[in-house]
């Protein structure tokens, strides 16, 4: 049986009653919206009975999602991880040779915000706070993500201009938001996006006949790869974490 392990004990939290969707989000299970869906589908139990939407629970209650027991983690955790190339984010990929969960050994279950495809590398943020994950991934918030990109042929001024103005992606039937882009070499550029469409940069480049040969995410909001080597991770500093929560419009509790 999988268990969300307690990072530190806090008697006051055991006594405090909170709505069950918030309880699940606080402990890194999912966002509140996803929690409401799980509750509506009868997949959450409290002390052996099916939980109801809007009911309140505390640390003494036995809360399960399916067969997985949820225990309260008093401390909010955010990790910065340097994902190497060849590593898959999604645990649902049956063909994945190596998962990020194989590389991160941490005492609390954490979930990533904004995946990178297998052939991409760079910064992933992971947390046990479902509300933070949801806030970081919400496209309407316009959070910045910065990338270094290498393509297969020489970059032109026309390419940069069109990429920066927004690109219609036929497969997704959407036009990307205008973005900041800067040439850094004959075949390389840096780009700052404020949305996270599936394989967005690769699709944008392909629209103009370019193929991406290397893609690295170097920044998410105020967090960078500084000090990290491929495959390594670290906890955010208190200052970094406080700013991240503030920029997401959340209060860390």
Label each residue range with its predicted role.
Residues 5-6:
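Basic polycationic patches enriched in arginine
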Residues 9, 14-253:
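Basic, flexible Lys/Arg- and Gly-enriched helix-loop patches that mediate nucleic-acid binding at interfaces
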């Amino acid at each position: 049986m999988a268990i969300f392990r307690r990072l530190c004990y806090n008697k006051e939290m055991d006594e405090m009653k909170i709505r069950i969707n918030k309880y699940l989000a606080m402990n890194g299970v999912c966002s509140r919206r996803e929690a409401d869906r799980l509750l509506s589908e009868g997949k959450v139990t409290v002390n052996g009975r099916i939980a109801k939407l809007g009911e309140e629970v505390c640390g003494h209650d036995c809360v399960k999602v399916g067969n997985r027991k949820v225990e309260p983690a008093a401390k909010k955790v955010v990790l910065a991880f340097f994902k190497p190339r060849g590593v898959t984010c999604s645990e649902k990929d049956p063909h994945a040779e190596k998962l990020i969960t194989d590389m991160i050994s941490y005492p609390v279950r954490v979930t990533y915000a904004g995946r990178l495809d297998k052939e991409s590398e760079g910064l992933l943020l992971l947390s046990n706070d479902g509300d933070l994950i949801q806030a970081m991934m919400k496209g309407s918030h316009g959070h910045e993500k910065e990338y270094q990109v290498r393509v297969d042929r020489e970059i032109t001024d026309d390419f940069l201009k069109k990429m920066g103005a927004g690109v219609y992606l036929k497969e997704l039937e959407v036009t990307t938001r205008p973005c900041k882009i800067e040439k850094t070499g004959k075949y390389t550029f840096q780009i700052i996006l404020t949305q996270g469409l599936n394989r967005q940069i690769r699709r944008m480049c392909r629209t103009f006949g370019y193929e991406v040969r290397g893609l690295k995410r170097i920044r998410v909001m105020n967090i960078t790869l500084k000090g990290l080597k491929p495959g390594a991770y670290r906890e955010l500093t208190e200052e970094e974490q406080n700013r991240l929560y503030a920029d997401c419009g959340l209060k860390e509790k």
